[in-house]
């Protein structure tokens, strides 16, 4: 499988998806036809989100079609060489994808050669479940099971920092709560600016920041760019 799982879409001082464009270009391998899954967009319309994505990726020669615009979404997924899943609200993304019957077809198409690109919520959707999203559950997705393309759980936008005086849980504390009730899981705390690239059977960590791996009953382990999962 070919996956590009990005923690986030924007870095300080850079345009939207700017840091991801070289990564996308290097993994295209001649692919040009893409479907975009905009369902995580809540405060922007799906048309706006699709147009924004198409404009940014056009210089790479990628032709982007919004899945909500086509008459036959299943046929569009079958024909797609690239499946792009945008960030936003993960619960909304999963709900809309499930209700349209797109989860199994997307997973199957990626397993048969389509490139999967997802940032933030889109990275969460590639995991076995969405249980490590940071998002508010604004809708009920009728279950947390997701695409299960990547075997570990990703927590995007990972940071353990708290504002001065804040008394809420750290991100690690929230992840530890999950591991109490689901000790079989492994969670990757993927900070902004980092990504996981899967190609030719290898999953490799990229980016300038330290990534953390959490397992039940164990201390967190720090990983740096180049680590192979």
From Swiss-Prot:
Superkingdom classification of source: Bacteria
GO terms under biological process: proteolysis
Record bears the keyword Amino-acid biosynthesis: no
Enzyme class: hydrolase
Location of the protein in the cell: Cytoplasm
One function term, GO molecular function aspect: serine-type peptidase activity
A GO-annotated cellular component: cytoplasm
Active site: 120 (charge relay system), 135 (charge relay system), 157 (charge relay system)
Keyword Cytoplasm in record: yes
InterPro entries noted in UniProt: Class_I_gatase-like, Peptidase_S51, Peptidase_S51_dipeptidase-E
Enzyme Commission number: 3.4.13.21
SUPFAM superfamilies associated with the record: Class I glutamine amidotransferase-like (SSF52317)
Role according to the record: Hydrolyzes dipeptides containing N-terminal aspartate residues. May play a role in allowing the cell to use peptide aspartate to spare carbon otherwise required for the synthesis of the aspartate family of amino acids.
Protein's recorded name: Peptidase E
Organism of origin: Salmonella heidelberg (strain SL476)
Lineage: Bacteria, Pseudomonadati, Pseudomonadota, Gammaproteobacteria, Enterobacterales
